[in-house]
Amino acid sequence: MFTQCEAIQCRTLFPVQDSPSIKSTYKVKTSVISPLTFLFGGIKKNSYLDTKTNQNISIFEQKIPIPSYLVAFVAGELEYGKISERCGVWTEIGLCQKACHEFKDAEKYIQIAEEYFNHPYEWEIYNLLVLPFSFPYGGMENPNVTFVTPALLAGDCSMSNVIGHEISHSWTGNLVTNKNWKNFWVNEGFTIFMERKLDSALLGEDMENLESIVGNNELIADIKMLGLDCEYTKLSPNYGGNDPDDGFSTVPYEKGYQFLIYIEKLIGKDNFKEVMRKYIKKYRYKSVDYTAFKEVLENLIKEKLKDDSKKIIDQINWDKWLYEKGIPSYKCEFSSKLLKEAESLAEDFLQEKEDKTIALKTFKEWHTNTKLAFLNYLSDNKNKINEKIAKNLKNELNLSEDYNSEIKYMWYLIALDKKMEEEIPNIQNFWKLMED
């Protein structure tokens, strides 16, 4: 048993003012038949076995005020693995060792985020829960028990950036929370920004640029799918009483990220970092809209940039960024050497001039994001892929044997488009795994 409360599902569990504008602390007593384990989003204060009823009894406490959408609990036959003094992972029996290896960088991510924000991780412990394959929800930043999809267990730590995203929420989203769902970007745009700062620190700045390019491509695709005139393509949409999940897309994530990158380029990285630090310090434990960030930003601009402050403040067109539909008018320019390498190898395959040995070696050495950029380029040019090229891709790069589910997914879409009958059993097995 497990929960998913974001955006407005907590009201189905118990009577609650189910709005992110309202935060509260809580203390919970749980019971579950032994040998099952019950976890609740908080710090376990006590636990014991009631021998009369054969029930495992636990007391959990959440001392930091949180909104209802972050309430989470799970019960099942679980095992725990320790990553560091404050980080660990819960899984179904048999997956724990694999998960500990996959998420071994969790502590590094926390330390980098603490340095960037100049603010400690306040939640005491950071535990992950690997969900069952029957509910492979990408990631949910529930305090003290972050839920993640089992698809992250690729075996090579190639999907750890998802953990970076959820850890970043410990500051942007969980400490400082969007006041309402039209300000969802205050959670997710800020968190994408921080996720990429973490990846930049661990994997290099060019990886941040590559992720930004891929994110922009996904943003444009989502906006076109929704329709350029759709209300939900605004950074701050009016849901009109509808379920916020009805308008879910990459818009609050990627358009929000691009707005922050635009501001960072305008005032400089060091100044922007100071804005983020002041923002977290001032509004921790609170629910805010964008005006809270705007206030901190403009105050710092006046303090640090003095003579140029009015000119810079006037350059930031908040109404345009927040309420303009469609693709952002301001084009953020990102350049990535990794993207060029990925597209170059893809072109070699399309022109049938790849060196088999070098191609496999290069592909194996790439990070998942670079591999996905390679496959995205092929997908965009799939009209150029003939039967021979498709077989070369499969045989020379061992794409069907890749442990990463995103790589397999992208490859199988190409294989289906090219009617590769030999891949049908692999595709069926992949689909069955997602259903189990």
Describe every region a protein language model picked out:
Residues M1-E124, F248-T250, I267:
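Acidic/His-enriched low-complexity segments
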Residues L36, P65, L152-L153, L416:
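Hydrophobic pocket-lining residues within nucleotide cofactor-binding pockets
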Residues K281-E435:
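Beta/coil-rich, acidic/histidine-enriched accessory regions frequently appended to metallopeptidases
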Residues V28, V148, W411:
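Divalent metal-coordination and catalytic microenvironments
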Residues F60, V89-K353:
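Hydrophobic alpha-helical and helix-loop surface patches within well-folded domains
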Residues L39, Y137-G139, E422:
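Generic domain-boundary/flexible-linker signal
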Residues P15, F38-G41, A72, Y80, ...:
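Generic detector of low-complexity/intrinsically disordered segments
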Residues F14-V16, E115, S134, D246-F248, ...:
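Generic recognition of flexible, low-complexity loop/linker segments
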